Amino acid sequence: MAVSMASQFFSQEEGTSEVVSTSERVVELLNMAALATNDTKITMLKQVQELIINKDPTLLDNFLDEIIAFQADKSVEVRKIVVNFIEEACKLDNELLIKLIANLHMLLKDENVNVVKKSILTMTQLYKVALQWVARSRPPSEQQESCWDLVTEMAADILLLLESDNDGMRTHAVKFVESLIVTLSPRTADSEVPKRQDGDISLEQIPPDHQFLKYNTLRDLGKQAVKELLKFMAHPAISSINLTAALGSLASIARQRPMFMAEVIQAYETLHANLPPTLAKSQVSSVRKNLKLQLLSVLRHPSSYEYQGPISTLLLDLGTSQGEITRHLPPPRDSNRKRAREDGEGGQKKSRTDIPLPDDDDDKDTMQLPTIPAPAPSTQSATDITADFVRPLLSPENVANLVLISMVYLPDSMPASFQSTYTPVESAGTDSQIRHLARLMATQMSAAGIGPGVEQSKDIPVDVVEEENIKPEGLVIKRRISALTKGQAISVLGCQSEKTKEEEEEEDDAPLAKKRPEPILPATQIRPSGVGGRKKVFRLKEVTEPLTDVQIKSLKLGAVRRILQAERSVGSSGASQMRVKVLARLVTQLDISVKAEVLSHFLNDPRMRLDLALAWLYQEYCEYQSGAGEEGYQECLIGILTGLQERPDQRDGVFTKVVLEAPLLTDSALDVLRKYCEDEGRSYLGMSTLRDLILTRPARQFQYLHLLLDLSSHEKDKIRQQSLHFIKRMYEKESLRPYIEKFALNYLQLLVHPNPPSVLFGADKDTEVAAPWTEDTVKQCLYLYLALLPQNHKLIHELASVYTEATADIKRTVLRVIETPIRGMGMNSPELLLLVENCPKGAETLVTRCLHILTDKVPPSPELVKRVRELYHKRLPDVRFLIPVLNGLDKKEVIQALPKLIKLNPIVVKEVFNRLLGTQHGEVSSSLSPLTPGDLLVALHNIDSSKCDMKSVIKATNLCFSARSVYTSEVLAVVLQQLMDTTPLPMLLMRTVIQALGMYPRLGGFIMNILTRLIYKQVWKYPKVWEGFIKCCQRTKPQSFSVLLQLPPPQLLSVLQTSPDLRDPLLAHVRAFTPHQLAHVPHSIMAILEAESRTDAGAEEAAQVEEEQETPAQDIIARRLAQEKSLKKQIEEQKGRNNQEMEEVAEVDPPAIFIAEEEEEESLKSQGKEEPQEDSSSNATTAEKSPVADEPMEEEPVEKKD
């Protein structure tokens, strides 16, 4: 539509104002973006792109350099925006490719993965744009040719990224390769063309007479890309993400370029037969599902008609139903229509393109236009040959034999991975299934390098292989050297003819014809200049003089110092790693002074310069491995470790990091590590390092473990305890346990030597020295063993074995130090119980000590008591074994063992009584003892004198009385009561009575009752007891006077003869009686008391006469009744006057002279006359049956009056 000049003029005026405002806005945004932060900068640059690309493209040339300058920005997102701007700008104006393709090449080499991925996506679009632009240029310029060379080089770089370490980069590279293959292959009638790619260029659109775009070269590039993609998908370690992307790309290629459908189907078959072993179970399921979807999409394509058999078989193996396969088959009519259209278009194309092409100066071959390839490849592959070989062999008999043979190697249960992917074969035995099985087997055989197909491929003549290999190499455009480093380069096109020497010389002399595209660089950078003409070669030797050794050394040292001092400036520029590498390489090649300078530099700040030390150390190790001596590495390692050890503050673990990162630890380095561990302030860090070495370096772990074990016998307690702590944790590991046990037992066995070996004093050899064993040296041999004992109870038997052969001094030390480990084992340890049961000869004291330790604070277990009892009764009848388990024995067993126990050492006897009385820890708790305190004291009195001497029994009773908190007055009262009931009377009865009275004087009344009962038991018949009776009467006078008056005359006379000092007080006591009371005192008693002036013989005769004289029973009873009434009256008066406090003792019987009235009446009726002795015995019987009085016996009235 024509526009008038006036309307054009006015529209230009309106546009000018708009451009000015847009331009100012762009300038403003660019200035603000240069100073803004990342987020704001990104927003502004997006606005700039919107204004320039979409609103006013005329501003593109004006602000191109300013926008491209942001490609050096530190922000990744900013650089990605620059990549996107390059794409949009080049699509808008293809001529900008000449300016911007070099910048895109730089961004393709960016250090950030995301920028590289964005650049690959941009290249996916710009490759087609560049090819279309170059193909339509008639004639193309040299700049376009150079630009296309760089685009081709970038495509080759992206192909190499298929081997990248980054999953995302590989995925983006797969997508680029897919686009590259579609672009560099002809579009046919059956090709699917996505709507968004409808206008894209393809190979058939390349002009046949183009100056440098060669049809065959581009076609071979596309085929080579197909091979690279297939090779990538067949890699055994391909990831699930990459495999999914490759499957989709191959399916897309097969639909858009049916000529490659055969290769795609074969690749799918190979993948189905050889899934990568690195995939997880869930990934395998995902890949199989994706493979099924891609096969269905390929099956829907009209060109899949020739491949429906293998595709259907694969789908059936993947679990697809036959109905679903049928639904995805292309309609026959569509297929026929497309074939007709293909034939028509093919004829037209043939008529249009079958024009002879003019000769090209660069390539003398005649170009042939593309024809639609046959569906199957013209030559058979190794897989096809092997499949043809295997297929006839798959007869039912052979298959059955193979199944039977393979069943031997099958697992008992179906593996989960196989079960999850297995699908039943629906068409088993059919011809298609046999062909499919043959191809699967052939694929696996070819991958393994076996089969006739592989053999035939090896037998191909060498000239054919060379010819096939030479052709693509000549056609592939060679890689260029980067323009940033070389300036200019000549584009080399495919050519098979070799150049002569003359032609090469001419090319060398010729100036460079084409200039490679250069990137737009920021103003602050210096643009590299191109190579000019020839220059005179500069020879350094012509202008320099040799330096002296001193100068050389000084220059070297100065250079290294400058590098060291430039640490901060180099770090700010981001070249720290390069600086470290340079220093590491330099220092290994220079002399000691330089090494000392670098070491000093490191030690000034070890934490920040650790990377330098490790780089230097590894460089020295590389030199050592390459054949140099070990001295350099040794000096470097020792220098670093020693320097770190000498530093006062080492809390950041640099020493540990160096030790753990060092590639090799020499013996000298281990010596430094040992000294580090022996420093009390660093012992934990040093031993932690040793532990990490043991766990992370299995090749020499026992050497490091030996060092840690050596420290377990260190003389410093802190070092030793720290070492034992780590060893016990190492002991939990099964692989280290035998070595640790062996070391501990070796040290334990040293105790059998007559003298301590020198190994205990730090010497290298195990030789004995003249020094005797001391407690410290004995403990050195035991520390590790005792630390392991609670963790491995079986080691206790080794201690018993060594103990039997050791000297007395060693045994004493062993007994002192085993308390903690034995307590840690516990009395329920099976090994400890076994030791008790099988106590070795000579280890009795060790076993006894163990028993004492185990039962010191807790009662013995029934199992322990059982083992000790069996040991005592069957093998070793040593009563000392029973002491620790006394509280677990029966009462009868303890009483039987008492005679032997009290004959032991006094200290041991005291321990026995402490256990029985429950007072071993200063607390009274006899609830667990089989004997009560009273039972124990009674048992001691009843010990047979033939089994134990009386002296030991007396000492034992004294121990009981020393436990005053146990033997209270109540307990003693019960004991005395039990002893009184014993027949015959115990020999030590009166001694106990006297001791009880001495401990508790308030028992006086109860004692009087005891004495009275003893008269009834005719105590004078027991000489020892009678002697004690007299002594007790002496000590308890005047309370005992009433008891003495109850004695028969002969026994009273014996008492007065034994203790004459009792006569006068007793006589005075009697004379103080009232006449009524005195009338009841027998004349014989008075005669004995008043016979002081007579001779002893006369007194005896009078006593005998009085005894023989028969007195009527009535007179005796009357006198005693009177005495009873008189005494009772006196007692009541005494209670009223003194109000004496009642004593809490056992009830006592009344004196024998007090007879109840009922007994008096019975005696009057039944008896005539009785002898005094018989009367005493009858009263004694009565007293025994009477209960113990609650009140103590009162003192005599005469004493109270006084």
UniProtKB/Swiss-Prot annotation:
GO terms for biological process: mRNA processing. Keywords: Cytoplasm, mRNA processing, Nucleus, Repeat. Residues 323-382, 496-532, 1096-1115, 1130-1202 are annotated as: Disordered. Residues 334-353, 1130-1140 have a biased composition (Basic and acidic residues). It is found in: Nucleus; Cytoplasm. Residues 1191-1202 have a biased composition (Acidic residues). HEAT repeats lie at residues 20-54, 57-91, 94-136, 143-182, 217-256. One of its GO terms (cellular component) is cytoplasm. The HEAT repeats have been determined based on 3D-structure analysis of the D.melanogaster ortholog and are not detected by sequence-based prediction programs. Involved in histone mRNA 3'-end processing. Involved in the cytoplasmic polyadenylation element (CPE)-mediated polyadenylation of maternal mRNAs in maturing oocytes. Serves as a scaffold upon which cytoplasmic polyadenylation regulatory factors are assembled. Identification in a complex with cpsf2, cpsf73, cpsf160 and sympk. Interacts with cpeb1, cpsf2 and papd4. Belongs to the Symplekin family. This is Symplekin. It comes from Xenopus laevis. The gene is sympk.
